[in-house]
Amino acid sequence: MLTIVIGLAAADFITGIIKACVKNDLSSRVMRIGGLHKICEIIVMAVACGLEIGIELLGHYYQAAELAAVSGTVAAGLVFGYIVLMELISILENYGEISPDAVWVLAIIQKLRGFQKEDTKDVQAKTHTTRKRK
């Protein structure tokens, strides 16, 4: 899992640099921040893998190996799935801005952003009503 995350993070970083070169918007500050984000993603995935191993070892210690294996795998799998999805979307966004022929990619990204805005509105509405109740 960690190898895939590292590969996707590198691909996203490289496509981001290509996009910046194509748009004449290359900035060392933006590259530094992007690189730090990628390092944080790799650290989070490494911690999730360590958590999976730790939960499995605890399961063996407490004679609940099957439950521990499942819960550790689910935890690491969810983190892995989120990071992979996030990286793939970012790579597609970069590709859509690099290639003028990638209209289909931009259409998909706009739909995803529409879903994201709706989700954000729902979260903000729930937060606002919760604050009113307090």
Where in this protein do the model-derived segments appear?
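Short, aromatic-rich membrane-interface segments at the entry and exit
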Residues: 1-2
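Membrane interface segments of multi-pass transport proteins and intramembrane proteases
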Residues: 25-29, 60-67, 96-103
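Juxtamembrane helix-capping/reentrant segments at transmembrane boundaries
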Residues: 25-45
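Membrane-proximal cytosolic segments adjacent to transmembrane helices
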Residues: 85-134
